[in-house]
Amino acid sequence: MQKVIVVTGLSGAGKSTVSKALEDLGYVVVDNVPVDLLHNLLELYEAKNQEQLVAVVVDSRSLRHQGEVSKFVADLKDLKNRMPLDVIFLEASTDTLLSRFNLTRHLHPLVHATGSRIALIEAIEREKELMSELRDVSDVVLDTTGMKERDLVYQVENFIGKDRGPEFYLISFSYQRGLPTNADMIYDARVFQNPYYVDELRTLTGLDDSVAEYVRADHNYGRFLDLWVELAERSYNEHIKMGKPYLVIGVGCTGGQHRSVLVVRDLSDQLTKNGHKVITWHRELGSVN
């Protein structure tokens, strides 16, 4: 087969959106695959069509116990040695998942998993614990908290694109709204002077030149940026040695509007100049580049 994508993660985190995106990219998508049949299914497609793009969705509907998850992880490692296979793991904050389930009125797959009905929040937390082993071996972990559907599609398209995948994911965020759960490292942009307290800059963002000029005028800005670029590249090199193909860096400030956005912007420019492929996501602004 040309390529296999395994889509997994938490219920309500966006697997349906990713499945539709993969179909649009020419993948045959098989949903809710029984894990015991995964080997046979992929072997069938491999024998039938060497050029077929295949995506399978596997989640807690078919992984109900820790033993099943552990066996599935072992199966994935075996399959990776035999065919080109990547695992995409989707997650979101508990509050986000609660909101999505309450909006759609769908029943969480673990609500009845123990034979008796449990609260939705308990089902979500149980699933996070259950799927943690699978999360740890995934090729990419996408946190869809606050992410619009088109932004998720964009990130998936970039990950599975024909060119090499991104080496850095840079996320600007507000500390008031929580840290991005998939970040490998956090940079704190609150050390710089805050444009929020300048009336003519308050409603602007770190994408505006006037805000950039103000923040860059901080005597610490250039030194911190140079150090952060060096740290990012050194950390990425160590991640590569551990078999991890990319590094996720979160950059936070108070509101996620000014300083963190600019730092992500400048980090991206410098890392790109240094030959790296970078994806940026300004979480509080709802934009991906």
UniProtKB/Swiss-Prot annotation:
Belongs to the RapZ-like family. Displays ATPase and GTPase activities. GTP binds at D59, S60, R61, S62. Keywords: ATP-binding, GTP-binding, Nucleotide-binding. It comes from Coprothermobacter proteolyticus (strain ATCC 35245 / DSM 5265 / OCM 4 / BT). Disulfide bonds: none annotated. ATP binds at G9, L10, S11, G12, A13, G14, K15, S16. The keyword ATP-binding applies. GO terms for molecular function: ATP binding; GTP binding. This is Nucleotide-binding protein COPRO5265_0725. InterPro entries: P-loop_NTPase (IPR027417), RapZ-like (IPR005337), RapZ-like_N (IPR053930), RapZ_C (IPR053931).
